[in-house]
Design a protein with these regions (language model features):
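P-loop NTPase motor module signature
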Residues: 1-223
Length: 223
């Protein structure tokens, strides 16, 4: 469930009847919703459910500040468990900046290049459903001729379609997965050897002149 659903569950049933533990996965993807969800869960544990277990998981988070926070609020002993991860060498290549108007054409060409130069499945990050459908049309001929399965992955897809994108192809075909950043940190897709990131995303932006919030295609930036 999402943090928003958890919040509504606590509002409707503050004791979280029938729930023994809450797992906060990928907690390094900090947001106001995840922080608020953890705060509410700690409040439930301290005030109503001293048996409620909270598990916070992350592959990259600095655990010390979080452990200090939990020690200050949790009624149960805070235990830190660490497991060794696996690292693989990654060859990073950059192309010139791609403008929005040429996004579909340039991405399609990069996919064709990756198909010819590399084995394994290809994961492509695109801004949204529109660009995903456009790229899928552009590479349809390539996919048909090379016996490649093209899968799409975005939030509005049904569960079965999302599972088809994540799971190995039942016929053993090579896959090209066209995805929004839904798969960037929260999913593991086996078999992927090439990742193409367009560095564009659709983000909700508020426009004060019209008092409307709308999806805007913009570059992804760490600034």
């Amino acid at each position: 469930i999402t943090e928003g659903v958890l919040t509504r569950m606590i509002q409707q049933d503050p004791e979280l009847t029938g729930i023994d533990a809450i797992v906060f996965d990928e907690f390094h993807e900090r947001s106001i919703h995840s922080d608020f969800g953890l705060a509410l869960a700690l409040e439930v544990q301290s005030g109503l459910r001293d048996d409620l277990r909270l598990v916070v998981m992350s592959a990259t988070l600095d655990i010390a500040p979080l452990q200090t926070l939990l020690n200050g609020f949790s009624l149960l002993p805070v235990v830190n468990l660490e497991t060794q991860g696996r690292m693989f060498p990654v060859d990073v290549r950059y192309t010139r900046d791609v403008q929005a108007y040429e996004l579909v054409a340039k991405t399609s060409n990069l996919i064709k290049q990756a198909v010819s130069e590399h084995d394994g499945d290809i994961l492509v990050f695109l801004p949204g459903r529109g660009s995903i459908n456009a790229v899928a049309r552009e590479i349809k001929g390539l996919a048909d001729s090379a016996d490649i399965a093209v899968q799409m992955l975005y939030g509005a897809l049904g569960k079965s379609a999302q599972q088809a994108a994540i799971a190995p192809d039942p016929q053993g075909k090579r896959k090209i997965i066209l995805s929004t950043n839904i798969a960037e940190t929260s999913l593991t897709i086996e078999g992927v050897t090439v990742v193409i990131d367009t560095l564009w995303e659709n983000s909700a932006q508020y426009h004060p002149s019209s008092d409307i919030t709308a999806l805007t295609q913009q570059r992804i930036s760490q600034a």
